[in-house]
Protein backbone atom coordinates (compact mmCIF):
# COMPACT_ATOMS: atom_id res chain seq x y z
CA UNK A 1 0.00 0.00 0.00
CA UNK A 2 1.20 3.54 -0.74
CA UNK A 3 -0.29 5.27 2.30
CA UNK A 4 1.80 8.36 3.20
CA UNK A 5 4.42 7.33 0.60
CA UNK A 6 4.63 9.58 -2.43
CA UNK A 7 4.50 7.87 -5.83
CA UNK A 8 5.97 9.83 -8.73
CA UNK A 9 4.25 10.11 -12.12
CA UNK A 10 5.69 11.40 -15.40
CA UNK A 11 4.72 10.95 -19.04
CA UNK A 12 7.88 10.06 -20.95
CA UNK A 13 6.15 9.39 -24.26
CA UNK A 14 7.74 5.98 -24.72
CA UNK A 15 4.35 4.56 -25.66
CA UNK A 16 4.68 5.86 -29.20
CA UNK A 17 8.30 4.94 -30.03
CA UNK A 18 10.26 2.71 -27.71
CA UNK A 19 7.33 0.38 -27.06
CA UNK A 20 6.77 0.11 -30.81
CA UNK A 21 10.42 -0.88 -31.30
CA UNK A 22 10.21 -3.35 -28.43
CA UNK A 23 7.15 -5.22 -29.70
CA UNK A 24 8.43 -5.14 -33.27
CA UNK A 25 11.59 -6.81 -31.98
CA UNK A 26 9.50 -9.50 -30.25
CA UNK A 27 7.67 -10.21 -33.51
CA UNK A 28 10.98 -10.53 -35.35
CA UNK A 29 12.21 -12.97 -32.70
CA UNK A 30 9.02 -15.01 -33.07
CA UNK A 31 9.51 -15.10 -36.85
CA UNK A 32 13.10 -16.24 -36.39
CA UNK A 33 11.89 -18.87 -33.94
CA UNK A 34 9.73 -20.38 -36.67
CA UNK A 35 12.76 -20.67 -38.97
CA UNK A 36 15.33 -21.81 -36.39
CA UNK A 37 14.54 -25.59 -36.27
CA UNK A 38 16.18 -26.18 -39.63
CA UNK A 39 19.44 -24.49 -38.55
CA UNK A 40 19.99 -25.47 -34.89
CA UNK A 41 19.64 -28.61 -32.81
CA UNK A 42 16.47 -29.41 -30.87
CA UNK A 43 17.91 -28.69 -27.40
CA UNK A 44 19.05 -25.17 -28.28
CA UNK A 45 15.74 -24.53 -30.05
CA UNK A 46 13.83 -25.46 -26.89
CA UNK A 47 15.91 -23.02 -24.78
CA UNK A 48 15.40 -20.16 -27.26
CA UNK A 49 11.68 -20.93 -27.50
CA UNK A 50 11.14 -20.81 -23.75
CA UNK A 51 13.24 -17.66 -23.46
CA UNK A 52 11.02 -15.85 -25.96
CA UNK A 53 7.83 -17.21 -24.34
CA UNK A 54 8.95 -16.03 -20.89
CA UNK A 55 9.92 -12.59 -22.21
CA UNK A 56 6.53 -12.31 -23.94
CA UNK A 57 4.63 -13.32 -20.78
CA UNK A 58 6.62 -10.85 -18.68
CA UNK A 59 5.85 -8.12 -21.22
CA UNK A 60 2.14 -8.93 -21.19
CA UNK A 61 2.10 -8.97 -17.38
CA UNK A 62 3.99 -5.67 -17.24
CA UNK A 63 1.51 -4.06 -19.64
CA UNK A 64 -1.39 -5.27 -17.51
CA UNK A 65 0.27 -4.35 -14.19
CA UNK A 66 0.98 -0.77 -15.29
CA UNK A 67 -2.41 -0.22 -16.96
CA UNK A 68 -5.67 1.28 -15.71
CA UNK A 69 -6.93 -2.30 -15.21
CA UNK A 70 -4.10 -3.29 -12.85
CA UNK A 71 -4.84 -5.16 -9.62
CA UNK A 72 -2.59 -2.60 -7.91
CA UNK A 73 -4.48 0.55 -6.87
CA UNK A 74 -1.26 2.56 -7.01
CA UNK A 75 -0.59 1.48 -10.61
CA UNK A 76 -4.18 2.19 -11.66
CA UNK A 77 -3.93 5.75 -10.33
CA UNK A 78 -0.50 6.16 -11.92
CA UNK A 79 -1.77 5.03 -15.33
CA UNK A 80 -4.77 7.36 -15.16
CA UNK A 81 -2.61 10.33 -14.18
CA UNK A 82 -0.28 9.61 -17.12
CA UNK A 83 -3.35 9.68 -19.33
CA UNK A 84 -4.33 13.08 -17.86
CA UNK A 85 -0.84 14.46 -18.63
CA UNK A 86 -0.92 13.05 -22.17
CA UNK A 87 -4.49 14.06 -23.08
CA UNK A 88 -4.06 17.60 -21.72
CA UNK A 89 -0.66 18.01 -23.41
CA UNK A 90 1.15 18.74 -20.18
CA UNK A 91 4.51 17.79 -21.69
CA UNK A 92 7.12 19.06 -24.15
CA UNK A 93 7.85 16.59 -26.93
CA UNK A 94 11.44 15.39 -27.19
CA UNK A 95 13.17 12.92 -29.54
CA UNK A 96 12.89 9.97 -27.17
CA UNK A 97 11.78 10.97 -23.66
CA UNK A 98 9.30 13.82 -23.22
CA UNK A 99 9.77 16.56 -20.62
CA UNK A 100 6.46 16.37 -18.77
CA UNK A 101 4.64 17.77 -15.79
CA UNK A 102 5.60 15.81 -12.66
CA UNK A 103 2.89 14.51 -10.32
CA UNK A 104 3.15 12.79 -6.96
CA UNK A 105 0.33 11.11 -5.06
CA UNK A 106 -0.22 9.54 -1.66
CA UNK A 107 -3.03 8.63 0.76
CA UNK A 108 -3.44 10.35 4.11
CA UNK A 109 -6.41 10.11 6.49
CA UNK A 110 -8.87 8.63 3.96
CA UNK A 111 -7.97 11.22 1.33
CA UNK A 112 -5.95 10.95 -1.88
CA UNK A 113 -3.47 13.81 -2.30
CA UNK A 114 -2.11 14.59 -5.76
CA UNK A 115 0.66 17.16 -6.14
CA UNK A 116 1.50 18.71 -9.52
CA UNK A 117 4.96 20.27 -10.01
CA UNK A 118 5.18 22.51 -13.11
CA UNK A 119 8.94 23.11 -12.60
CA UNK A 120 9.02 26.35 -14.53
CA UNK A 121 7.11 25.05 -17.54
CA UNK A 122 4.07 27.16 -18.41
CA UNK A 123 1.32 24.82 -17.21
CA UNK A 124 -0.08 27.15 -14.55
CA UNK A 125 -3.18 28.20 -16.48
CA UNK A 126 -4.08 24.53 -17.01
CA UNK A 127 -3.30 23.48 -13.44
CA UNK A 128 -6.00 25.73 -12.02
CA UNK A 129 -8.66 23.64 -13.79
CA UNK A 130 -6.84 20.31 -13.79
CA UNK A 131 -8.51 19.18 -10.56
CA UNK A 132 -11.88 18.72 -12.28
CA UNK A 133 -10.21 16.71 -15.08
CA UNK A 134 -8.54 14.40 -12.55
CA UNK A 135 -11.82 14.14 -10.64
CA UNK A 136 -13.57 12.82 -13.76
CA UNK A 137 -10.70 10.49 -14.67
CA UNK A 138 -10.39 8.93 -11.20
CA UNK A 139 -14.13 9.07 -10.44
CA UNK A 140 -13.37 10.55 -7.02
CA UNK A 141 -14.80 13.74 -5.48
CA UNK A 142 -12.42 16.70 -5.50
CA UNK A 143 -12.84 18.26 -2.06
CA UNK A 144 -10.04 20.81 -2.09
CA UNK A 145 -7.33 22.35 -4.26
CA UNK A 146 -4.46 24.38 -2.89
CA UNK A 147 -1.81 26.61 -4.41
CA UNK A 148 -0.16 27.54 -1.14
CA UNK A 149 3.36 26.59 -2.22
CA UNK A 150 5.23 28.27 -5.05
CA UNK A 151 6.40 25.04 -6.65
CA UNK A 152 3.21 22.97 -6.68
CA UNK A 153 -0.55 22.60 -6.88
CA UNK A 154 -2.20 20.15 -4.49
CA UNK A 155 -5.52 18.42 -5.22
CA UNK A 156 -7.30 16.55 -2.43
CA UNK A 157 -9.83 13.83 -3.26
CA UNK A 158 -12.29 12.01 -1.05
CA UNK A 159 -11.21 8.38 -1.26
CA UNK A 160 -13.87 7.02 1.07
CA UNK A 161 -17.09 8.99 1.29
CA UNK A 162 -18.20 9.89 4.84
CA UNK A 163 -20.98 7.75 6.27
CA UNK A 164 -24.37 9.34 6.73
CA UNK A 165 -25.74 9.66 10.26
CA UNK A 166 -28.96 7.75 10.97
CA UNK A 167 -30.78 9.55 13.75
CA UNK A 168 -31.29 7.60 16.97
CA UNK A 169 -31.64 8.61 20.63
CA UNK A 170 -28.16 7.32 21.43
CA UNK A 171 -26.69 9.83 19.02
CA UNK A 172 -27.80 12.79 21.13
CA UNK A 173 -26.62 11.19 24.34
CA UNK A 174 -23.09 11.06 22.94
CA UNK A 175 -22.99 14.65 21.64
CA UNK A 176 -20.11 16.72 22.93
CA UNK A 177 -20.98 20.13 24.39
CA UNK A 178 -20.66 22.89 21.82
CA UNK A 179 -20.32 20.44 18.92
CA UNK A 180 -22.92 18.82 16.65
CA UNK A 181 -21.98 15.81 14.50
CA UNK A 182 -23.07 16.19 10.87
CA UNK A 183 -21.75 12.93 9.38
CA UNK A 184 -19.06 10.38 10.22
CA UNK A 185 -16.29 12.92 9.50
CA UNK A 186 -17.79 16.40 9.74
CA UNK A 187 -18.98 18.24 12.81
CA UNK A 188 -20.05 21.79 13.57
CA UNK A 189 -18.23 23.45 16.46
CA UNK A 190 -20.92 26.10 16.86
CA UNK A 191 -19.39 27.53 20.04
CA UNK A 192 -16.33 28.56 18.06
CA UNK A 193 -17.85 29.04 14.60
CA UNK A 194 -21.43 30.26 15.17
CA UNK A 195 -24.64 30.60 13.16
CA UNK A 196 -25.95 28.66 10.16
CA UNK A 197 -27.70 29.13 6.82
CA UNK A 198 -29.69 26.17 5.48
CA UNK A 199 -30.95 26.58 1.91
CA UNK A 200 -33.04 24.24 -0.21
CA UNK A 201 -36.19 24.10 -2.25
CA UNK A 202 -39.33 22.23 -1.18
CA UNK A 203 -38.58 18.51 -0.89
CA UNK A 204 -34.83 19.03 -0.53
CA UNK A 205 -34.66 17.79 3.06
CA UNK A 206 -34.11 21.19 4.65
CA UNK A 207 -36.81 20.82 7.32
CA UNK A 208 -35.57 17.46 8.59
CA UNK A 209 -32.04 18.79 8.84
CA UNK A 210 -33.36 21.70 10.92
CA UNK A 211 -35.24 19.19 13.12
CA UNK A 212 -31.93 17.41 13.65
CA UNK A 213 -30.17 20.63 14.64
CA UNK A 214 -33.01 21.54 17.03
CA UNK A 215 -32.83 18.09 18.66
CA UNK A 216 -29.05 18.42 18.96
CA UNK A 217 -29.32 21.81 20.65
CA UNK A 218 -32.11 20.65 22.99
CA UNK A 219 -30.06 17.60 24.00
CA UNK A 220 -27.35 20.05 25.11
CA UNK A 221 -29.80 21.89 27.42
CA UNK A 222 -30.23 24.81 25.02
CA UNK A 223 -33.12 27.24 24.98
CA UNK A 224 -34.58 27.18 21.45
CA UNK A 225 -36.95 29.73 19.89
CA UNK A 226 -38.59 29.19 16.50
CA UNK A 227 -39.85 31.73 13.98
CA UNK A 228 -41.97 30.17 11.23
CA UNK A 229 -44.01 32.79 9.30
CA UNK A 230 -45.54 30.16 7.00
CA UNK A 231 -46.84 28.20 10.00
CA UNK A 232 -45.66 24.93 8.49
CA UNK A 233 -43.63 22.06 10.00
CA UNK A 234 -41.56 23.95 12.56
CA UNK A 235 -44.62 25.83 13.81
CA UNK A 236 -46.16 22.54 14.98
CA UNK A 237 -43.40 22.23 17.59
CA UNK A 238 -45.18 24.88 19.69
CA UNK A 239 -47.32 22.09 21.15
CA UNK A 240 -44.17 20.45 22.52
CA UNK A 241 -41.65 23.14 23.41
CA UNK A 242 -44.34 25.64 24.40
CA UNK A 243 -46.25 28.37 22.56
CA UNK A 244 -44.10 31.16 23.98
CA UNK A 245 -41.10 29.69 22.13
CA UNK A 246 -42.71 29.64 18.67
CA UNK A 247 -43.82 32.71 16.69
CA UNK A 248 -45.13 33.32 13.17
CA UNK A 249 -45.92 37.05 12.89
CA UNK A 250 -43.51 39.90 12.15
CA UNK A 251 -43.95 41.26 15.67
CA UNK A 252 -43.49 37.78 17.13
CA UNK A 253 -40.21 37.24 15.29
CA UNK A 254 -39.01 40.71 16.31
CA UNK A 255 -39.92 39.74 19.88
CA UNK A 256 -37.71 36.62 19.69
CA UNK A 257 -34.80 38.70 18.41
CA UNK A 258 -35.32 41.25 21.18
CA UNK A 259 -35.20 38.42 23.73
CA UNK A 260 -31.97 37.17 22.16
CA UNK A 261 -30.47 40.65 22.24
CA UNK A 262 -31.53 41.14 25.87
CA UNK A 263 -30.05 37.73 26.74
CA UNK A 264 -26.71 38.89 25.35
CA UNK A 265 -26.87 41.96 27.61
CA UNK A 266 -27.70 39.80 30.65
CA UNK A 267 -24.85 37.41 29.93
CA UNK A 268 -22.44 40.26 29.33
CA UNK A 269 -23.30 41.61 32.78
CA UNK A 270 -22.88 38.18 34.40
CA UNK A 271 -19.53 37.62 32.72
CA UNK A 272 -18.28 41.10 33.58
CA UNK A 273 -19.28 40.81 37.24
CA UNK A 274 -17.54 37.45 37.56
CA UNK A 275 -14.36 38.52 35.82
CA UNK A 276 -14.95 36.21 32.88
CA UNK A 277 -15.30 38.87 30.22
CA UNK A 278 -11.63 38.41 29.36
CA UNK A 279 -9.90 37.70 26.08
CA UNK A 280 -10.63 34.19 24.81
CA UNK A 281 -13.38 33.41 27.34
CA UNK A 282 -16.98 32.72 26.39
CA UNK A 283 -20.33 31.57 27.82
CA UNK A 284 -19.05 28.05 28.54
CA UNK A 285 -16.60 29.37 31.13
CA UNK A 286 -19.60 30.34 33.27
CA UNK A 287 -21.59 27.18 32.48
CA UNK A 288 -24.24 29.02 30.47
CA UNK A 289 -26.33 26.98 28.02
CA UNK A 290 -26.77 27.90 24.33
CA UNK A 291 -29.62 30.29 23.48
CA UNK A 292 -30.79 29.59 19.92
CA UNK A 293 -33.15 31.22 17.43
CA UNK A 294 -34.29 29.19 14.40
CA UNK A 295 -35.96 31.23 11.64
CA UNK A 296 -37.56 29.65 8.56
CA UNK A 297 -38.25 32.04 5.65
CA UNK A 298 -37.87 35.14 7.80
CA UNK A 299 -38.19 37.35 4.69
CA UNK A 300 -41.91 36.49 4.43
CA UNK A 301 -42.78 38.82 7.32
CA UNK A 302 -40.61 41.70 6.14
CA UNK A 303 -43.26 42.84 3.67
CA UNK A 304 -45.93 43.04 6.38
CA UNK A 305 -44.53 46.03 8.23
CA UNK A 306 -41.48 47.97 6.98
CA UNK A 307 -40.80 49.44 10.41
CA UNK A 308 -40.76 45.99 12.04
CA UNK A 309 -38.74 44.65 9.10
CA UNK A 310 -36.01 47.21 9.78
CA UNK A 311 -36.00 46.25 13.45
CA UNK A 312 -35.69 42.57 12.52
CA UNK A 313 -32.70 43.26 10.25
CA UNK A 314 -31.03 45.47 12.87
CA UNK A 315 -31.47 42.98 15.73
CA UNK A 316 -30.51 40.02 13.56
CA UNK A 317 -27.28 41.74 12.53
CA UNK A 318 -26.45 42.57 16.16
CA UNK A 319 -27.10 39.02 17.40
CA UNK A 320 -25.06 37.46 14.59
CA UNK A 321 -22.17 39.89 15.04
CA UNK A 322 -21.94 39.60 18.84
CA UNK A 323 -23.69 36.36 19.79
CA UNK A 324 -20.83 33.85 19.76
CA UNK A 325 -19.14 34.92 23.01
CA UNK A 326 -22.46 34.92 24.86
CA UNK A 327 -23.70 31.59 23.48
CA UNK A 328 -26.51 33.17 21.45
CA UNK A 329 -26.86 31.53 18.03
CA UNK A 330 -28.99 31.92 14.91
CA UNK A 331 -30.08 29.37 12.29
CA UNK A 332 -31.59 30.82 9.11
CA UNK A 333 -33.49 28.61 6.66
CA UNK A 334 -34.69 29.69 3.23
CA UNK A 335 -35.61 28.52 -0.25
CA UNK A 336 -34.15 31.61 -1.92
CA UNK A 337 -30.84 32.68 -0.36
CA UNK A 338 -30.63 36.02 -2.18
CA UNK A 339 -29.59 39.41 -0.80
CA UNK A 340 -33.22 40.43 -0.21
CA UNK A 341 -33.77 37.38 1.98
CA UNK A 342 -30.45 37.38 3.84
CA UNK A 343 -28.33 40.55 3.53
CA UNK A 344 -24.72 39.98 2.48
CA UNK A 345 -23.41 41.56 5.69
CA UNK A 346 -25.26 38.89 7.69
CA UNK A 347 -24.36 35.99 5.39
CA UNK A 348 -20.64 36.81 5.63
CA UNK A 349 -20.76 36.29 9.41
CA UNK A 350 -22.35 32.82 9.23
CA UNK A 351 -19.99 29.87 9.77
CA UNK A 352 -22.09 26.86 8.68
CA UNK A 353 -23.61 26.98 5.19
CA UNK A 354 -25.59 24.07 3.77
CA UNK A 355 -27.50 23.60 0.51
CA UNK A 356 -29.82 20.59 0.18
CA UNK A 357 -31.62 19.31 -2.88
CA UNK A 358 -31.39 20.66 -6.41
CA UNK A 359 -30.28 24.28 -6.56
CA UNK A 360 -29.15 26.46 -9.45
CA UNK A 361 -25.62 27.84 -9.55
CA UNK A 362 -26.64 31.32 -8.42
CA UNK A 363 -28.46 29.90 -5.38
CA UNK A 364 -25.43 27.77 -4.52
CA UNK A 365 -23.14 30.80 -4.70
CA UNK A 366 -25.47 32.85 -2.52
CA UNK A 367 -25.57 30.03 0.04
CA UNK A 368 -22.01 28.77 0.04
CA UNK A 369 -20.15 31.97 -0.88
CA UNK A 370 -18.82 33.74 -3.96
CA UNK A 371 -15.22 32.58 -3.61
CA UNK A 372 -15.68 29.18 -5.24
CA UNK A 373 -15.40 28.77 -9.01
CA UNK A 374 -15.83 25.01 -8.82
CA UNK A 375 -17.88 22.59 -6.73
CA UNK A 376 -17.07 18.92 -6.19
CA UNK A 377 -19.03 16.38 -8.20
CA UNK A 378 -21.96 15.37 -6.04
CA UNK A 379 -25.62 14.49 -6.11
CA UNK A 380 -28.19 17.17 -5.33
CA UNK A 381 -31.30 15.37 -4.16
CA UNK A 382 -33.41 15.02 -1.02
CA UNK A 383 -31.09 15.34 1.96
CA UNK A 384 -28.00 15.69 -0.25
CA UNK A 385 -26.08 18.73 -1.42
CA UNK A 386 -23.07 20.79 -0.35
CA UNK A 387 -21.63 22.14 2.88
CA UNK A 388 -19.04 24.69 3.92
CA UNK A 389 -17.83 25.08 7.51
CA UNK A 390 -15.56 27.92 8.60
CA UNK A 391 -12.47 26.98 10.56
CA UNK A 392 -11.90 23.65 8.82
CA UNK A 393 -9.24 24.96 6.43
CA UNK A 394 -11.33 24.13 3.36
CA UNK A 395 -10.81 26.14 0.18
CA UNK A 396 -14.06 24.93 -1.37
CA UNK A 397 -17.39 23.38 -0.26
CA UNK A 398 -17.75 19.61 0.11
CA UNK A 399 -20.49 17.16 -0.72
CA UNK A 400 -22.88 16.40 2.12
CA UNK A 401 -25.60 13.96 3.11
CA UNK A 402 -27.66 15.29 5.98
CA UNK A 403 -28.58 13.09 8.97
CA UNK A 404 -31.45 10.78 8.07
CA UNK A 405 -34.55 9.96 10.09
CA UNK A 406 -35.30 6.28 9.42
CA UNK A 407 -38.96 5.29 9.46
CA UNK A 408 -40.05 4.13 12.92
CA UNK A 409 -36.51 4.49 14.31
CA UNK A 410 -37.30 7.68 16.21
CA UNK A 411 -40.51 9.58 16.92
CA UNK A 412 -39.55 13.17 16.21
CA UNK A 413 -42.11 14.83 18.47
CA UNK A 414 -41.44 12.45 21.35
CA UNK A 415 -37.73 13.10 20.94
CA UNK A 416 -38.25 16.88 21.07
CA UNK A 417 -40.43 16.43 24.15
CA UNK A 418 -37.79 14.24 25.78
CA UNK A 419 -34.94 16.71 25.32
CA UNK A 420 -36.98 19.87 25.85
Predicted regions and their residues:
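Short, conserved catalytic or adaptor-binding loops enriched in Gly and charged residues
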Residues: 236-240, 345-348
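Short acidic/His/Gly/Ser-rich catalytic and metal-binding motifs that mark active-site loops
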Residues: 233-237, 301-304
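Hydrophobic/aromatic beta-strand patches that form the interior of the parallel beta-sheet core
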Residues: 196, 225-227, 352-354
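Accessory regions of macromolecular translocation/handling assemblies
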Residues: 1-222, 248, 266-270, 291-294, ...
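Mechanochemical coupling/switch segment within NTP-driven translocation systems
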Residues: 223-225, 230, 237-292
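P-loop NTPase motor-domain active sites and their immediate coupling elements
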Residues: 2-15, 37-44, 262-420
Amino acid sequence: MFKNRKTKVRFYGINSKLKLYYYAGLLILLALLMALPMYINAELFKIVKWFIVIISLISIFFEYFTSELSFSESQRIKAKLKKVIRDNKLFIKRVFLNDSLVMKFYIKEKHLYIEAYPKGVDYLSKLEKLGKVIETTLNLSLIDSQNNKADRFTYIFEKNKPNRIYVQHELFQNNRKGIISLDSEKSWNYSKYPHAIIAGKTGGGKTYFIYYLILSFLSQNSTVFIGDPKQKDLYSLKHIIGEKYVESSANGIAKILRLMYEEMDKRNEIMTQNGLNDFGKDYRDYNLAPFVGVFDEISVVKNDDLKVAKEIDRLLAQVIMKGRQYGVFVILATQKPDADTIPTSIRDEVSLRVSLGKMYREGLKMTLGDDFDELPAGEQSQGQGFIFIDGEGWSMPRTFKSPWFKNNEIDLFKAVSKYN
